[in-house]
Design a protein with these regions (language model features):
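N-terminal glycine-/charge-rich "phosphate-binding" loop or analogous flexible N-terminal tail
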Residues: 1-43, 164
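Phosphate/diphosphate ligand-binding glycine-rich loop within oxidoreductases
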Residues: 44-124, 136-140
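Rossmann-like dinucleotide/phosphate-binding beta-alpha-beta segment
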Residues: 132-180
């Protein structure tokens, strides 16, 4: 069996797969759609993250493809319906990076509320700290609205509460008891 890795993934993934099949990693990560189409013909397993899009053209070029392993949560970059029609199984990794995404969300909230990016730029360009130019606001006591309260949204809410924020959330797909 042949496996093609088309994005930066943990070396442990390639090492583990290498025990069972011939593993190749694209020279350019991620490859362009045309490069992928040219190199996917005899591949059985495709390991990727989000680029390039796996559409009908790519799937038709993949004559032997049996499995697409996605090292992320979302599958909106793959024509999953057509993959299923062709007998290609598509797997993702729910929860893989949820905590990292939630932490980054809180980080961006802090950057915006504390003006850290423009303050850093001012210090590096002007070589001085103007403590009055970048007065920020605390997160404590603020209300955070979360649209979509799946794993990541719930984790953002947990972290925000630690900062003393009130969290309100909406998700049409979850039962009411999730929000209490």
């Amino acid at each position: 069996m042949k496996c093609l890795i088309i994005d930066v993934v943990s070396p442990a993934i390639a090492e583990e797969l290498g025990k069972y099949m011939d593993v190749t990693t694209c020279e350019q990560l991620p490859p362009s759609k045309d490069e992928l189409k040219a190199g996917i013909g005899d591949v059985d397993v495709l390991i990727m993250r989000v680029d390039p899009k796996i559409d009908k053209e790519v799937l038709d070029a993949a004559k032997n493809l049996k499995v697409i392993g996605v090292c992320s949560v979302g599958l909106n970059h793959i024509d999953t319906k057509y993959a299923e029609e062709k007998g290609v199984k598509v797997f993702n990794a729910p929860g893989l990076n949820g905590n990292a995404v939630a932490e980054l969300t809180i980080c961006k909230m802090l950057e915006l509320s504390r003006h850290t990016i423009p303050a850093h730029r001012d210090v590096t360009v002007n070589e001085k700290w103007d403590k009055y130019a970048f007065v920020g606001r605390e997160l404590r006591g603020k209300t955070l609205g979360v649209l979509g309260f799946g794993r990541i949204g719930q984790r953002v809410g947990e972290i925000a509460r630690v900062f003393g924020m009130k969290v309100v959330a909406y998700d049409p797909y979850l039962p009411a008891e999730v929000f209490t």
